[in-house]
């Protein structure tokens, strides 16, 4: 099965780091594009942006009622000019199903059934491209320079000064940047990762899984 598109943006970055230094804890905040909710998601965002363009966009700076948005369907509140931190089904302990997928699939893909994972998944007014702010803790000390050097050689990964979803739309690689030591934990790193959720998160990953299965079949 094709894993969740947010998880798949993170794995090409986390896997080589784990192989080298041993991942023990993972904290992630995700910033997920409208296209993650399908065509209906991008259409709803487009309609909301059009309504704002026809109204008083600048008025939103001090009055939420300055624009009359169409009634939201995919999300509980308008996504345009906004962020939505609760747009999935709530599960155990207040985590959404998307946040639990991030935990469970990270454990499965990395082969770490007891990996400590905590995530917050947020929908943002971006058409395509999921982003993650990642705090990762490792068994062994690692510097930002060592991590960047490792990631620069990792397949499917590019190291950028400013990873952003607009520039990564339509590209197969995932982009990582803002790599630095985490001052709040031992042996920790902070990274920002971006991937096209319609390619690496979905179509491209499905092709790569099929190719791997064909190779296994001989």
What do the predicted segments below correspond to?
Residues 1-40, 190-218:
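Adenosine-phosphate binding glycine-rich loop
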